[in-house]
Amino acid sequence: TVSGILIFSHNQVLAQVTPDNTLGDESSVVNLRDATTDSIDGGAIRGQNLFHSFEEFNVSEDRGVYFANPDAVTNIFSRVTGNDVSNILGTLGVDGAANLFLINPNGIIFGEGASLDVQGSFAATTADGIQFGKQGFFSASNPESPKLLTINPSAYLFNQIENQAINGIESKAALSVPKGENLVLLGGNILLNGSEINTPGGRVELGGLATTGKIEIDNTLGLKFAQNVAKEDIFLINGTSINTSGEK
């Protein structure tokens, strides 16, 4: 019996990517690339980092959403400031080699038909925000325009109201990143239900938190849990497989 798992419904999914206005003149812009693909342009560039902010972020079945990757950008951070779960039912990609971070404190679902088309590493988290050393934060729960956040991220911040459950991540998808890259799923309960995760020569980092806390990030996007952080369950069911060797 699996208890305490946050179950999300795929019914009545609004397949929509809607930028918010928290970045002002640097707001994200969604352009139709072709009949089945949207391109996300704009955003706020700070050194090697590109920041996007959305009221809602979903990828519908049989569609693709790709982030533009400007020159010199090595990390793309995408936060959801609205109140809805992100349903990734199609292809989520990057037009370049930047690492992609998807941040939605409400929860994230990867449906059976979801896939990644990235050349870098990928991280999905229900954290409230990401810390950049002493430079500051990029927060989904207290959104503002990013200041001088030019360094690599240093920690995921879970600042939910005390005694309020941290929302989870569910995947039924085959999710892959290229050779030597890493894939991170970090939230409350992590449920991999018939999912297939492939990171040939890289790492899979799965982390579940039961309470508020800070999870540090190393220079390879690896997770560093403090001993006093209460951990939540991670479920791998219905033939879920995780492959880091490059062999099947």
Question: For each predicted feature, which ranges?
Answer:
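Extracellular and secretory-pathway beta-repeat/beta-biased strand scaffolds
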Residues: 1-248
